[in-house]
């Protein structure tokens, strides 16, 4: 059995922009089918993924507000990054992978505003 774990956000009750800390777990049911689906998704959306992975520029100043180059490295596909997806691609991704039950998703959502200073002060306990 394969279980993949990823986190998003920060455990901190003094950063109003970080409202939640999320831990996601993906339990793979059929790894071969999932690998094939992943490759199919990437190949059928290659040009769109490449376009989404470019630097995002401020419309007035032209400064880079969000760096690209996270899904593609040295001109080759590396990995999917949900942070690079727009709403349309996120919807397409969910629709595509929910067709066949190749994995299950579990998550833990921690509301940072409910954490106490006492809890956050003890980092060993907080992060373990």
Predicted regions and their residues:
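Phosphate-ester processing/binding pockets and catalytic centers
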Residues: 1-128
């Amino acid at each position: 059995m394969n279980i993949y774990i990823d986190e998003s956000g920060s455990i901190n009750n003094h950063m109003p922009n970080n409202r939640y800390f999320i831990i996601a777990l993906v339990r793979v049911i059929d790894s071969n089918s999932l690998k094939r689906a992943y490759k199919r998704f990437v190949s059928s959306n290659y040009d769109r993924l490449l376009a989404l992975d470019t630097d995002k520029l401020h419309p007035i100043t032209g400064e880079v507000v969000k760096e690209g180059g996270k899904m593609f490295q040295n001109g080759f596909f590396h990995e999917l990054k949900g942070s690079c997806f727009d709403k349309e691609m996120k919807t397409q991704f969910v629709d595509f992978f929910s067709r066949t039950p190749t994995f299950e998703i579990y998550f833990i959502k921690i509301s940072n505003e409910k954490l106490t200073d006492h809890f956050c002060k003890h980092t060993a306990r907080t992060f373990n």
